[in-house]
Amino acid sequence: MDVTAKIARFVVDTKYETIPSKAIETAKIAVRDCLGVALAGSKEEDAKICAEIARQEDAKEEATVIGQGFRSSALQAAFANGTAAHAMDFDHSFTLMGQPTAPIIPAVFALGESLGASGRQILEAYTTGFEVTGKTRLFAARQQA
């Protein structure tokens, strides 16, 4: 099985019940942190520009654009919210992993909102995305060494 297939299998096989409780508690903190940072960042110029692009798109109102008072397509909401989450550079970081939460949470929330996902499903998706990010970065670091 190649690396891509292994990652896909891991994503498909991961269920909320299999995620350690410590990881879930840490994920809850990270989600709250990211949403707070995105709300603050939504007032920054770059985030406002991305939000305006999302507003101009003639799209279904699938997901909230944080701090802007409107909804857009899941794609545009994820883009605008991801920009807002990074805008003030307050997102947490890890030496090897960079800043995985700010790109993951906006995508997970936008898609989750558009599909009617539960809180458990949001946490499952976030922790799975975080784990995949960490493992792929570790793999890449070993390949470069």
Label the predicted regions.
Residues 1-145:
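N-terminal core-entry segment
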